[in-house]
Amino acid sequence: MQKLLIILILFCILKFNVDVEGRTAFPCNQSKCQERCKKEIKKGKCILQFISVSASQSCRCY
């Protein structure tokens, strides 16, 4: 039971606090993504990101 609780907590942390290398776990808006990445002199693209068993759109700067 404790292992299940730890896995659930880690899943929630990864799902809601992802902000690594230009990726966020919030729904992606293509124009806002491009604008945000333009500040870093990079191109922005909305990608489908899979976290465990769920999927979400996120912004990726490259």
UniProtKB/Swiss-Prot annotation:
Q: Where are the transmembrane segments?
A: none
Where does it live in the cell?
Secreted
Site features described as Aromatic residue of the functional dyad, chain residue numbers: Y62
What are the protein's UniProt keywords? Answer: Disulfide bond, Ion channel impairing toxin, Neurotoxin, Potassium channel impairing toxin, Secreted, Signal, Toxin
Task: List, in alphabetical order, the Gene Ontology terms for molecular function in this entry.
Answer: potassium channel regulator activity; toxin activity
GO (cellular component) term, any one: extracellular region
Entry comment describing in which tissues the protein is expressed:
Expressed by the venom gland.
Q: Which residues form the signal peptide?
A: 1-22
Disulfide-bonded cysteines: C28-C46, C33-C59, C37-C61
**Residues the record marks as site: Basic residue of the functional dyad:** K45
The Swiss-Prot or TrEMBL record describes its family as follows: Belongs to the short scorpion toxin superfamily. Potassium channel inhibitor family. Alpha-KTx 23 subfamily.
Q: What is known of its domains?
A: Has the structural arrangement of an alpha-helix connected to antiparallel beta-sheets by disulfide bonds (CS-alpha/beta).
What this chain does, per the entry, is described as: May block potassium channels.
Name-wise, this protein is U10-hottentoxin-Hj2a
